[in-house]
C-alpha cells in the first residue's frame, strides 16, 4: 500500500485521498472556523476512483490523512474478451487483465494504446491515446 501522509489543509479539489481504504478524488473541500476558541474544520467530499462511491469526512484542518501514490502508465490493448481487456504494459511488457470501463467501451479496440492508473493495488483504464 503506497501512501503518503499530509495535513488536510494542504489538499485541493481534484487531488486524491484515501477514504475508507479506497483511493478517492476530492470533489469539494470547504473550511470553516467554528468560533473564538475552536479549531478550523474541513469538510471534504470525494468520489472513489475504482468504485465511484461518494464519501465525506469532517475533520480539523491539521489532521493528518493518507494520500495514495498513483502510478500513471501506458499500455497497448492486446485483446478484448467480453467485459475484460488484456493489456501489455509498454515499459516492462507485463500482461494485465483489466475490466472494460463503460464510458470507453466504443473507443477501445485491439492494438490501440491506453492510459491506465495503479493505486493501492487496483488498476483502471482512464483514457485512450
Curated annotation (Swiss-Prot):
Where does the record say this protein resides?
A: Cytoplasm
Which InterPro entries does its entry note?
A: IF5A-like (IPR001884), IF5A-like_N (IPR048670), NA-bd_OB-fold (IPR012340), Rib_uL2_dom2 (IPR014722), Trans_elong_IF5A_hypusine_site (IPR019769), Transl_elong_IF5A_arc (IPR022847), Transl_elong_IF5A_C (IPR020189), Translation_prot_SH3-like_sf (IPR008991)
Q: Does the keyword Cytoplasm apply?
A: yes
Q: Would the keyword Cytoplasm turn up in this protein's UniProt record?
A: yes
Sequence positions bearing Hypusine: 36
Q: Name one GO biological process term.
A: positive regulation of translational elongation
Instruction: Name the SMART domains on file.
Output: eIF-5a (SM01376)
Coarse class of the protein's main subcellular location = cytoplasm
User: What keywords are assigned to this protein?
Assistant: Cytoplasm, Hypusine, Initiation factor, Protein biosynthesis
Recorded GO CC terms: cytoplasm
The entry lists its GO molecular-function terms as:
ribosome binding; RNA binding; translation elongation factor activity; translation initiation factor activity
Xref: SUPFAM superfamilies: Nucleic acid-binding proteins, Translation proteins SH3-like domain
Q: Which family does it belong to?
A: Belongs to the eIF-5A family.
Function, in words: Functions by promoting the formation of the first peptide bond.
> What PANTHER family does the annotation carry?
TRANSLATION INITIATION FACTOR 5A FAMILY MEMBER
Stated name of the protein: Translation initiation factor 5A
**What organism is the protein native to?**
Methanobrevibacter smithii (strain ATCC 35061 / DSM 861 / OCM 144 / PS)
